[in-house]
Regions:
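Active-/binding-site microenvironments in catalytic and ligand-binding cores
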Residues: 2-284
Length: 284
């Protein structure tokens, strides 16, 4: 991206640190890390599959007549009006950012858990690191040791407020029923390792930050141990954090670090999550 500015003399340019005369050059690549919200895809449990009712331009013309008494449809350009969509979905549909309130009413060992409208926006724009665990099988744990080894491999040290992205390859199954059981997942200890480093936002290209629910259910049935249930989510009871789920296209980033992620969530009052369109930004 090339930005050209014809600078004029004045205090605004001095405050902004811009040259009094000249050209500002910027080259960046923007990578969309979200999936598209679509109706009727079987990649969610039935109760969570989005529904979209589309109001086309012809129907919009009819609706506009209610807002403009006396308006005739042929008075509109081409006899057409506005288009609208009516959606029925959850805050966890599509790519979204979960708030600490999703996991439990409290966080940080007893403080009220933040809802998505309370998330500090500075958490959602930061340096990022991509950890590739595509070699792990569906339902496998990504352990604390796995995370440490991967960071050593890519020669990166986590900083406070870094955004950590976990790549499992599950996004390749998006749009199919198999998506619900695809990918490895984080556990309590690996999640806490990141949080203890000062990380506040993480993300994964799978349906859940934890291992897929059917794998958790099978392990619980076998062992009877409730600690296997939602263990990575429940880590947020100890240290509050947010995670993005249903991310996509992480392979397009093309590097393990040296990029920024922007992932501001939609601000919904008292909500456990908000839709987001995360973007990786790479300076070229």
């Amino acid at each position: 991206m090339k930005i050209e500015v014809e600078a004029k003399d004045g205090p605004w340019f001095k405050r902004m640190g811009l040259p009094q005369r000249g050209v500002i050059m910027a080259a960046r690549r923007f990578i969309d890390l979200s999936i598209t919200i679509e109706p009727s895809l079987p990649s969610d449990p039935p109760m969570m599959i989005p529904k979209i009712d589309y109001l086309d331009h012809a129907m919009g013309a009819v609706q506009m007549q209610d807002f403009f008494p006396g308006l005739k449809q042929d008075q509109l350009p081409g006899g057409l009006g506005w288009a609208l969509e009516f959606l029925s979905l959850t805050t966890h549909s599509g790519t979204h950012l979960d708030s600490p309130y999703h996991y439990h009413p409290t966080m940080d060992m007893g403080k009220p858990a933040m809802t998505v409208d309370e998330i500090p926006i500075e958490w959602c724009f930061s340096d990022a690191v991509l950890l590739d665990f595509r070699h792990k099988g569906d339902g496998e744990r990504i352990t604390r040791e796995d995370v440490i080894c991967k960071l050593d491999e890519i020669k990166y040290e986590i900083k406070p407020l870094d955004i950590v992205l976990i790549q499992t390859g599950a996004d390749r199954a998006w749009g199919t029923p198999e998506y619900l059981v695809k990918g490895a997942g984080m556990d309590r200890e690996s999640t806490l390792y990141l949080l203890e480093k000062g990380v506040k936002v993480v993300g994964i290209d799978a349906w859940s930050w934890d291992r897929p629910l059917p794998f958790l259910a099978k392990e619980f049935e076998k062992t009877g141990d409730p600690k296997v249930i939602w263990e990575a989510h429940f880590a947020g009871i100890e240290i509050g954090y947010c995670h993005m789920e249903k991310m996509a296209n992480l392979s397009a980033i093309g590097r393990p670090h040296g990029f920024t992620v922007c992932c501001f969530p939609i601000k919904i009052k008292r909500a456990s999550a908000g839709w987001t369109r995360p973007v990786a930004i790479i300076d070229l």
